[in-house]
Amino acid sequence: SYQRFLFLVVVASLIATSLAIPKDLEKRGTTCYCGNTIGIYWFAKKTCPSGRGYTGSCGYFLGICCYPVD
């Protein structure tokens, strides 16, 4: 009974979290630096978003820093 309740709480939390995540993950990130070059930090991405004019990137904490900034 307790395990069943805990399972239902976890499932409900996962559903609520998935509904709260924005559908458009291509929103502008925050400022980051690739050496002396200023870029835009994208969390949990392995590549820069396409169609935004980025010409380079560097790995950044749990994401990527893409430059140049427009």
From Swiss-Prot:
Query: Has UniProt tagged this entry with the keyword Signal?
Result: yes
List where in the cell it is found. Secreted; Nematocyst
* Record-level GO cellular component terms: extracellular region; nematocyst
Q: Which residues form the propeptide?
A: 22-26
- Per the UniProt entry, the disulfide pairs are C32-C65, C34-C58, C48-C66
* Single Gene Ontology MF annotation: ion channel inhibitor activity
The miscellaneous remark of the record is: Shows significant expression differences between stressed and unstressed A.elegantissima.
Q: What is this protein called?
A: U-actitoxin-Ael2c
Q: Which organism is it from?
A: Anthopleura elegantissima
Q: What is the phylogenetic placement of the source species in the record?
A: Eukaryota, Metazoa, Cnidaria, Anthozoa, Hexacorallia
